[in-house]
């Protein structure tokens, strides 16, 4: 199931998502040394991704008649076994795992299954990953004063850098003076690092070695800066070529292939998205979305735009080319396929994300908000799959944070009825991620006084009560977190709605107080979430003000009467009884 863009969930990057050298708070590399060294490595950090390598060889069982070899030298036994082996991967394994007395859990890095001929982007990404990983590991070994390892890794780093420069020069289109200068500076620093680490091997005086360590850190820092500059220059040139091809091509197959390549680059992280935005990627993609001859490419182009707009530069470019107006036109034009409108909803969800501060000043969005909200409600109502509903509801949820007028529009458009009806349709609402979007909309709409009567009319209190019992099916961290958000927002919605006495009486009739007490007292019911606990305590206190007779004395004295912080501390320290 696709996750909504701009949803704010913190998910770990999968093995297919490895970013670039940009300074990202959540992707800092572990490098110990002077500040400049750490900063340089931070600037070139690439997320770890296991490159496809050789598979582990299964151990070959020994026959009983060969048990005597167990007492023989291990090398001799290996030589005997080698006669019977026909595995073609043995040499690969030997190359990847050098014989060494030094324990190193990661071993040496090799490029397995390297980029094909004429594929400069993959070459840059793979070589870039290897080099930045080597830089990080050199920093770690330097902090441990493992000088022999630092020197050997520095030599290997020089080889990787030379290979990247040589291979890219072979397949790149044209050479530039700026690129040549960056390559020269990088190789000079690589040679300097190898030379200074070699001298360190011959020094025994600790005081001299300590001063030389600072010199190595400085060199490593500068090397990282030069590598980052070279990689950015090379990637910028390749992105320019892709954008130019999209912008000038009138061939649907070339445009489709190039747009797909651009989308692949957006999955490599925010730094590449910034490069794409700066080099006109947003402008070129909206040009595709405005040509009827490319209608079949709209979903792919919009999906790429949603990825680019995770960075500030992408959103600014979108506003410059009247992207919001284009999205509104696509969403309101029913001649477009459902897939196209769903991808347009994904872009809207991204650019209205409440977690991105730079999206809060889109004046063009306010001008088109009514049309967009109306189209999104209709898309939710007519969605043929859970993914389409998820994208449309995620956009609506983010819009309710974006502007207060959106909640009033949703109320007038009978959004509560549409959303609550969808909750009973397993084809549209089948995951906690989707219910998270629905309850977010309800929580934000519940600040309106008129909302309570609509909720009761559509049997909404019972559905909200059901959300208080949301449980993960798979147990994955992302799904567990989504369930916690559903429980928390359901409790918040209930607390807000219970200002209306009719809603409060309905909640008491449906035994909401019992469920709230259970969530407060039983950590496992709320996955030990403090956010859920606070929301449930607030909702329980609101209900107790309307119907105090629904509480036992012990519950009232522990959960309602004390200050909220005291009740919170009491419940958060509770140990469950398994008797």
Swiss-Prot record:
Pfam families: Insc_C, INSC_LBD. GO terms for cellular component: cell cortex. SUPFAM superfamilies: ARM repeat (SSF48371). Gene3D superfamilies: Inscuteable LGN-binding domain, Leucine-rich Repeat Variant. Expressed in brain, kidney, liver, testis and skin. Changing residue 82 to E: Abolishes interaction with GPSM2. Residues 74-89 are annotated as: Important for interaction with GPSM2. InterPro entries: ARM-like (IPR011989), ARM-type_fold (IPR016024), Armadillo (IPR000225), Insc_C (IPR045789), INSC_LBD (IPR031938), INSC_LBD_sf (IPR038205), Inscuteable (IPR039921). Its main location: cytoplasm. Keywords: Cytoplasm, Developmental protein, Differentiation, Neurogenesis. A motif (PDZ-binding) lies at residues 576-579. One of its GO terms (biological process) is cell differentiation. It is found in: Cytoplasm; Cytoplasm, Cell cortex. It comes from the Eukaryota. May function as an adapter linking the Par3 complex to the GPSM1/GPSM2 complex. Involved in spindle orientation during mitosis. May regulate cell proliferation and differentiation in the developing nervous system. May play a role in the asymmetric division of fibroblasts and participate in the process of stratification of the squamous epithelium. Interacts with ALS2CR19/PAR3B and GPSM1/AGS3. Interacts with F2RL2/PAR3. Interacts with GPSM2/LGN (via TPR repeat region). This is Protein inscuteable homolog. It comes from Mus musculus (Mouse). The lineage of its organism: Eukaryota, Metazoa, Chordata, Craniata, Vertebrata.
């Amino acid at each position: 199931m696709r996750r909504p863009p701009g949803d704010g969930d913190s998910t770990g990057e999968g093995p297919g998502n490895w970013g670039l050298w940009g300074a990202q708070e959540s992707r800092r590399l572990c490098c110990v040394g002077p500040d400049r060294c750490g900063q340089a490595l931070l600037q070139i950090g690439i997320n770890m991704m296991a490159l496809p390598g050789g598979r582990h060889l299964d151990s070959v069982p020994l026959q009983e008649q060969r048990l005597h070899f167990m007492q023989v030298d291990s090398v001799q036994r290996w030589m005997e076994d080698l006669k019977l082996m026909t595995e073609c991967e043995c040499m690969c394994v030997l190359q990847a795992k050098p014989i060494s007395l030094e324990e190193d859990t990661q071993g040496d890095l090799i490029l397995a299954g390297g980029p094909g001929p004429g594929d400069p982007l993959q070459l840059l990404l793979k070589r870039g990953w290897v080099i930045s990983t080597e830089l990080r590991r050199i920093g770690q070994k330097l902090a441990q004063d493992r000088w022999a390892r630092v020197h050997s890794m520095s030599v290997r780093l020089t080889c990787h850098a030379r290979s990247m420069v040589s291979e890219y020069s072979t397949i790149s289109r044209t050479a530039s003076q700026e690129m040549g200068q960056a390559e020269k500076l990088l190789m000079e620093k690589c040679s300097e690092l190898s030379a200074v680490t070699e001298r360190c091997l011959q020094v025994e005086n600790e005081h001299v070695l300590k001063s030389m360590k600072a010199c190595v850190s400085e060199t490593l820092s500068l090397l990282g800066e030069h590598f980052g500059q070279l990689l950015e220059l090379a990637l910028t040139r390749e992105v320019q070529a892709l954008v130019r091809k999209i912008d000038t091509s009138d061939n649907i197959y070339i445009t489709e292939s190039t747009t797909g390549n651009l989308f692949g680059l957006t999955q490599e992280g925010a730094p590449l998205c910034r490069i794409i935005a700066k080099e006109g990627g947003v402008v070129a993609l909206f040009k595709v979305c405005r040509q009827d001859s490319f209608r079949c490419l709209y979903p792919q182009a919009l999906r790429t735009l949603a990825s680019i707009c995770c960075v500030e530069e992408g959103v600014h470019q979108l506003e410059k080319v009247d992207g919001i107006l284009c999205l509104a036109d696509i969403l309101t034009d029913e001649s477009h396929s459902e897939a196209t409108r769903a991808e347009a909803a994904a872009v809207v969800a991204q650019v209205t994300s409440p977690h991105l501060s730079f999206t809060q000043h889109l004046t063009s969005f306010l001008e088109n908000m009514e049309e967009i909200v109306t189209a999104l409600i209709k898309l939710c109502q007519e969605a043929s799959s859970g993914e389409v509903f998820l994208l449309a509801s995620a956009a609506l949820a983010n819009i309710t944070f974006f502007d207060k007028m959106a909640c009033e529009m949703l109320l007038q458009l009978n959004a509560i009825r549409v959303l609550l009806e969808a909750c009973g349709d397993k084809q549209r609402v089948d995951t906690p991620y989707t219910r998270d979007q629905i309850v977010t909309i309800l929580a934000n709409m519940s600040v309106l006084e008129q909302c309570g009567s609509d909720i009761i009319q559509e049997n909404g209190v019972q559905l909200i009560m059901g959300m208080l019992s949301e449980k993960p099916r798979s147990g994955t961290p992302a799904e567990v977190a989504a369930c916690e958000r559903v429980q928390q927002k359901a409790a918040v919605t209930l607390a807000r709605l219970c200002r209306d006495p009719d809603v409060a009486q309905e909640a008491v009739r449906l035994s909401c107080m019992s469920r709230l007490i259970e969530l407060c007292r039983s950590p496992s019911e709320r996955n030990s979430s403090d956010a859920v606990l606070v929301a449930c305590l607030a909702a329980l206190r609101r209900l107790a003000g309307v119907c105090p007779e629904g509480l036992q004395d012990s519950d009232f004295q522990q959960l309602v009467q004390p200050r909220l912080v005291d009740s919170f501390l009491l419940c958060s320290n509770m140990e469950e009884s398994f008797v």
